[in-house]
From Swiss-Prot:
Keywords from the named record: Antibiotic, Antimicrobial, Bacteriocin, Secreted
Protein name: Bacteriocin rhamnosin A
Reported function: Antibacterial activity against the Gram-positive bacterium M.lysodeikticus. It may act as a pore-forming protein, creating a channel in the cell membrane.
Entry keyword Thylakoid: no
Cellular location(s): Secreted
Primary subcellular site in the record, as a coarse category: secreted
Native organism taxonomy: Bacteria, Bacillati, Bacillota, Bacilli, Lactobacillales
Organism annotation: Lacticaseibacillus rhamnosus (Lactobacillus rhamnosus)
Assigned GO CC terms: extracellular region
GO biological process: cytolysis by host of symbiont cells; defense response to Gram-positive bacterium
Amino acid sequence: AVPAVRKTNETLD
């Protein structure tokens, strides 16, 4: 799940 999409979600948080 993505927390706030940093750029393009580097390592899928």
